[in-house]
Amino acid sequence: MKYLIDTHTHTIASGHAYNTIDEMTRKAAQIGLPAIAFTEHTPKMPGSCGKLYFSNFKVLPREKFGVHRLFGCEANIMDYDGTLDMPDTLLEKMDGGDLSYL
């Protein structure tokens, strides 16, 4: 099977991974992965990124080392109403994301 994209990855910014965005992009290029999505944990996850981190995605190149890069988050569902721990104003600027129940 040939993989086209890894849609759920974390970097050192999430607090429990060991590689940078560029290191992971370079590895994706080495193994022939055409695309990778960075879905860092949102602020309610202890040790993770603050909101400022996510607002800065706009300055990152969407392609590097021949790999298409998507930037998003792994947001937490905070209650039974579906409230997320990331404001819509930031979610709208992201390429995508995942949801978890905290």
Feature names for model-found ranges:
Residues 8, 28, 40, 69, ...:
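Divalent metal-coordination and catalytic microenvironments
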Residues 12-14, 42-47, 77-79:
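Active-site environment of divalent metal-dependent phosphoester hydrolases
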Residues 4-14, 38-41:
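Histidine-centered catalytic micro-motifs
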Residues 16-20:
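Glycine-rich anion/phosphate-binding loops
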Residues 22-36, 56-63:
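Alpha-helical scaffold segments that flank or form the walls of functional sites
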Residues 48-102:
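Extended substrate/RNA-proximal surfaces in nucleic-acid metabolism proteins
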Residues 2-4, 36, 70:
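Hydrophobic "anchor" residues on beta-strands that sit immediately upstream
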Residues 34-35, 39, 95:
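Short acidic/polar active-site loop segments enriched in Thr and Asp
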